[in-house]
């Protein structure tokens, strides 16, 4: 899934290009490269009203609630309930299996601040910014 992508980002292909790049990077490293065929990969589109990620000083509306600095830690925050709800739109994901489904949320920003939120039942949401850098400075490194 991606967040902070508006209608224009989706129409021009920026959204899908960002998602495909993230999938390529993720499965370009071991052990995921070897075991890629064992994964079901789905893209869920959630259109945001605004393009780009907001900050404490520049609030932008995002479908999944992504914002910089609104958490107590100062890190990127997200609305996990909406993320889980949308992830359940994938053909093989249910409320019962969401704890076995890693969710990667590609953020429409080039600011580095990736973080993963994990819960005791095994549920996880990884927030990954887009990358303009080459390896090993991109988000593979």
Identify the role of each PLM range.
Residues 5, 9-16, 120-141:
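Short pre-active-site segment immediately N-terminal to the catalytic Zn-binding motif
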Residues 104, 111-114, 121, 126:
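Nuclease catalytic cores that cleave nucleic-acid phosphodiester bonds
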